Amino acid sequence: MTTAPCVPNASSVARLSGRIQAGIPLAPLTTFRVGGKAEWYCEPHNNLELQQCLAWARAQGIPVTLLGAGSNLLISDAGLPGLVIHTRRLRGMQLLEGGRIWAAAGEPLVNLARAAAKRGWSGLEWAIGIPGTLGGAVVMNAGAHGRAMSDVLVEVQILDEEQEPCRLEPVDLQFGYRRSRLQDSPWTVTGATLQLLPGRDPAQVQRQTQRHLNQRLSSQPYHLPSCGSVFRNPETHPAGWLIEQVGLKGYRIGGAQISERHANFILNCGQASANDIYRLICLAQEKVYQRWSIFLEPEVRILGSFDDPLIS
């Protein structure tokens, strides 16, 4: 979805009422708390503004990066070229009949899980500890405790490559483990509709939701900035176990450390750079592959330029 970059002209920026800004730091907008600046940045407040921003970027011939909660991203210290669109203003939720929930792409997933539990609708208990937005969760097919977004999704609303609104069904999205067709498409998710199981005891659903949250908090390190799970789990063994077996649990490069509690987490211990984290990712891949010939595929989205390539 990119062509040769050019310099956006002042009049085209002005037509978007000053909503597009230059040189905005991205580190505060990610859970890793690292990364450089966005060349151009905007926070649309509705789908019309989103369409305008996408059309502007297309007219300028610059790439677009969508940013939700920033919980599954590693952004280069050099920052990102083109336009970064933050979806945190694109929020809203509707509890429909029969256990259906519609929400906008920027709505935090935890809000949906809590609203469903309060209503006595089962099916999102697992999502309570996932620090992402609905849009990002759909794109990544986020999941936990053996469940995933593809289990509850009935429809996704998108803007296609022409910025026209479309509706897609799960069969259109080629879901897999932490995968969907949306990851490699030029489409922009604007909202989604989920189907849950209504009529349950709200207190029981809320207790189960809280149990999932307690389990997550007890087994995973949330006291320092991280992206969540760094690698997808191979079919043979969990990624964290493989990393621990090659002696990297607690290993540190610069300000970044492979967690001593859960080796599939990398922590920013205070002054980490994106490159520190990236080097730990490369090291974990290298050591695991050397020992077992198992390729650890990153679950975290790695954006921007880094010096050394990952194993592929």
Curated annotation (Swiss-Prot):
Q: What is its EC number?
A: 1.3.1.98
Record's Pfam families? FAD_binding_4, MurB_C
> Which protein is depicted?
UDP-N-acetylenolpyruvoylglucosamine reductase
Q: Which UniProt keywords apply?
A: Cell cycle, Cell division, Cell shape, Cell wall biogenesis/degradation, Cytoplasm, FAD, Flavoprotein, NADP, Oxidoreductase, Peptidoglycan synthesis
Which residues are the active-site ones?
Answer: 178, 229 (proton donor), 299
**Cellular component terms (Gene Ontology):** cytosol
Q: In which pathway does it act?
A: Cell wall biogenesis; peptidoglycan biosynthesis
Q: Where in the cell is it found?
A: Cytoplasm
Which cofactor does the UniProt annotation name? FAD
The organism of origin for this protein: Synechococcus sp. (strain JA-3-3Ab) (Cyanobacteria bacterium Yellowstone A-Prime)
- What role does this protein play? Cell wall formation.
Name a GO molecular-function annotation: FAD binding
What family does the entry list? Answer: Belongs to the MurB family.
Does Cell cycle count among this protein's keywords?
yes
User: Which residue numbers delimit the FAD-binding PCMH-type domain?
Assistant: 33-199
**Catalyses which reaction(s):** UDP-N-acetyl-alpha-D-muramate + NADP(+) = UDP-N-acetyl-3-O-(1-carboxyvinyl)-alpha-D-glucosamine + NADPH + H(+)
Would you kindly state one Gene Ontology biological process term found in this protein's UniProt entry?
cell wall organization
Major location, coarse class? cytoplasm
Write the gene name.
Answer: murB
